[in-house]
């Protein structure tokens, strides 16, 4: 905008299927249910072990890997729950990619008045705003999933490099999650971070933690492990 190019920033945070507290609950339910079902399939489940698991669940720390140190069978619970989470997070099951894609393609086709979605934290905080895009030349989509395989229409994909700890700090400041610093949230962040690192291969530009803008080749030199 400083250079005279009109733009609009669209927040992808408004496009999950569920408001934050319901999506948090869905994530936890998926983890816990599939953890138990997986144990049943592997024949590592017993009624006695279920009692132990339920105590951890009540304490809100059933995703803590430290439990494996005392109960070796607990690895089955964690592994099966995590696998189910990996199949949910950042997919069409969680995010309404179709609606985002429709908006992006409508903008690129020259649409002038488009409905933009907004989402708060409560059931009543979901609404649409008719935005006039007349004269707007650039649509910036600010989104965790901007390099997702489910998302189309991006001309210049950008990846913002960060660590799970930095993401956690950002969410603490925004008060975005329930149980923000518990083991389950850290598991979610770890899964998302690995997913984003993989998707970063699609990015044409990478912004490092100090604000430096790099292309793919420069970033590979900046982060040697990407060259492996």
Q: What are these model-predicted stretches?
A:
Residues 5-124:
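Conserved nucleotide-sensing/catalytic segment adjacent to the nucleotide-binding pocket
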Residues 13, 140, 203:
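Conserved RecA-like P-loop NTPase ATPase core
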Residues 118-125, 138-144, 186-191:
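Short gly/ser/thr-rich secondary-structure transition/capping motifs
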Residues 156-160, 165, 169-177, 193-228:
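NTP-dependent small-molecule kinase module
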